[in-house]
Amino acid sequence: MYIKMATLANGQADNASLSTNGLGSSPGSAGHMNGLSHSPGNPSTIPMKDHDAIKLFIGQIPRNLDEKDLKPLFEEFGKIYELTVLKDRFTGMHKGCAFLTYCERESALKAQSALHEQKTLPGMNRPIQVKPADSESRGGSSCLRQPPSQDRKLFVGMLNKQQSEDDVRRLFEAFGNIEECTILRGPDGNSKGCAFVKYSSHAEAQAAINALHGSQTMPGASSSLVVKFADTDKERTMRRMQQMAGQMGMFNPMAIPFGAYGAYAQALMQQQAALMASVAQGGYLNPMAAFAAAQMQQMAALNMNGLAAAPMTPTSGGSTPPGITAPAVPSIPSPIGVNGFTGLPPQANGQPAAEAVFANGIHPYPAQSPTAADPLQQAYAGVQQYAGPAAYPAAYGQISQAFPQPPPMIPQQQREGPEGCNLLIYHLPQEFGDAELMQMFLPFGFVSFDNPASAQTAIQAMNGFQIGMKRLKVQLKRPKDANRPY
């Protein structure tokens, strides 16, 4: 990543700078940058620095402090050769860190010894970091070189929640020099029963693991003490990516190549069976789980490339689902057609739709049109043909009267709805296509509706709906003459 640098200006070139920096410049010169003095008729003079001078990384700096504010803090340890605050290349925003180089190596050693994790600057939660920059650590400055943090930082779990940092230090100090000891706490300030301990060397950390991991059970802990190396940044990133991939797989099963569809569909149906089993035990399924179950049911209804999905068995409150086998269906009728798109049938392979699944013996109620009485019911009303009473068994009992049906669908040859019925959707995942859009908006008619009421209902329910790491933005399509001033 390219980082824009903002470099310290050591003051204007005037008489004061002459006495402070010892470098001559005329009163009319433009300024003094990084120890360079400029005179109208003289070449620039570069201050000397030791051949083994150390470039320091400074972290945990308040973002409102620039070079001139930081200079007095570091000047007391020696003459500064260069001080640079890191800023974002595009936004120019302060990154909260800087690079510092002294003219003399000893000045860097003194600054690190006096400041590193010894002082917390105003507005910061952690003490200032003063250590060699990565390039220096890989180079010849061996006296300041340290092993990577992940090789000597330990995660400690199953602690007594009453233990403090001092208690943890006493437990681990027998194995070496402890640089950091931090107990993880919740928003209320109470301990979570785990901590991070950083040693000065990898060997010390390994010795602590060998001696303490599983060696004892702390009072109030459910199992023995856990001592292991903390996850690296790369491992944490990989775990987050796996979680994101799992979310995308749940909300976008159509993105999976159809060559391996059979095994994937079978796994989906196993997940659906588990969801429905939980319904049978608890009698209620939250809206997100109901939506996931509906997608699984739709996937089961697809018969792509001659591959048959695994059969689904209805689950009741007091029985275990038996195994059912059914022949593949070569073709499935298409009961729903919207704007030329073929709808997804609710049944496949002779299996009953999810209305046949009972929750603790509660029989399904007829699905109703969305009403203003329950916003969540509006959002998932169209899913009821698949999720049935599993989503809202209580709401079905309260709403028993019939509601008028919406006007008939627009003719298939019309590709765009009338004014006020067309939606513009932002932030869709790149792999989304027509099939995914239809699957997502089918409960409301489709993206292009035949009446403004359905369009407004879809906007209220789906605007802000999260898919993976994206949130949908749904709004009315602008009229064609919206940009005209008259």
From Swiss-Prot:
Q: Compositional bias of type Polar residues: which residue ranges? A: 18-28, 138-149
Spell out the coiled coil positions from the record. none
A Gene Ontology cellular-component term:
nucleoplasm
**One GO molecular function term?**
mRNA binding
| Region (Disordered) residue spans | 18-39, 121-149
Primary localisation category: nucleus
Membrane-crossing segments per the record: none
Q: What does this protein do?
A: RNA-binding protein implicated in the regulation of pre-mRNA alternative splicing. Mediates exon inclusion and/or exclusion in pre-mRNA that are subject to tissue-specific and developmentally regulated alternative splicing. Specifically activates exon 5 inclusion of cardiac isoforms of TNNT2 during heart remodeling at the juvenile to adult transition. Promotes exclusion of both the smooth muscle (SM) and non-muscle (NM) exons in actinin pre-mRNAs. Activates the splicing of MAPT/Tau exon 10.
The UniProt entry's sequence similarity note says: Belongs to the CELF/BRUNOL family.
The protein depicted here goes by the name CUGBP Elav-like family member 4
Which species does the entry assign this protein to?
Answer: Mus musculus
Give the classification, highest ranks: Eukaryota, Metazoa, Chordata, Craniata, Vertebrata
Name the gene that codes for it: Celf4
